């Protein structure tokens, strides 16, 4: 399944063909989540003003159109159980790090942090050795969970 924080599950290529607007054969390091497609595609089609205020994801249309306009975004990651929203994983993925937290019934029981530049195969969980980064990512994640009214925020 794809419900895991490893690169093999998260890093899925995306192809866009729009010869009038996007140069062919352009490679990009832009991180875009499936949920970002909704506001991004609406904006690209000229309906930016029609994106509902309730949309909780990112409009990445400017970054899609211009290779110079890159946004550094920590993409949220979540694996949840619909019957128990305080069990599962939540996390963030940046260009360098993968961060995830696991909780069972509202109790945090695992912290995961991988430096994908130093450990591209994600074999060494560096969370125990990086309390500053864990705190930084936890605060970012908590902000996202508050914004999305996710009860998992009480696990952090």
Regions inferred by a protein language model and the residue ranges of each:
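C-terminal cap/loop subdomain of S1 sulfatases and analogous C-terminal strand-loop tails that border
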Residues: 1-4, 22-24, 30-38, 42-112, ...
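Short Pro/Gly-enriched coil loops immediately N-terminal to beta-strands
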Residues: 5-11
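Generic recognition of stable, solvent-exposed alpha-helical segments in well-folded globular domains
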Residues: 7, 32-36, 132, 136
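Structural micro-motif
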Residues: 11-15, 38
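Generic structural marker for isolated residues within well-ordered, non-membrane alpha-helices
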Residues: 38, 123, 141
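Intrinsically disordered, low-complexity polar regions and short flexible loop motifs
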Residues: 119
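Active-site-proximal N-terminal segment of extracellular/periplasmic enzymes that hydrolyze or transfer
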Residues: 124-132
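Charge-dense polyanion-binding interfaces
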Residues: 136-154
């Amino acid at each position: 399944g794809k419900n895991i924080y490893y690169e093999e599950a998260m890093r899925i290529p995306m192809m866009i063909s729009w010869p009038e607007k996007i140069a062919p054969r352009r490679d990009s390091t832009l991180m875009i989540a499936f949920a970002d497609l909704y506001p991004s595609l609406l904006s690209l089609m000229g309906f930016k003003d029609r994106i509902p205020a309730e949309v909780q994801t990112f409009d990445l249309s400017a970054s899609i159109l211009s290779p110079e306009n890159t946004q550094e975004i920590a993409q949220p990651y979540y694996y949840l159980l619909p019957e128990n929203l305080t069990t599962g994983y939540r996390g963030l993925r940046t260009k360098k790090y993968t961060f995830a937290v696991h909780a069972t019934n509202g109790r945090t029981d695992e912290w995961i942090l991988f430096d994908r530049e130093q450990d591209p195969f994600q074999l060494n969980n560096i969370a125990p050795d990086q309390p500053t980064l864990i705190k930084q990512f936890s605060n970012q994640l908590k902000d996202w969970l508050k914004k999305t009214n996710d009860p998992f925020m009480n696990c952090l």
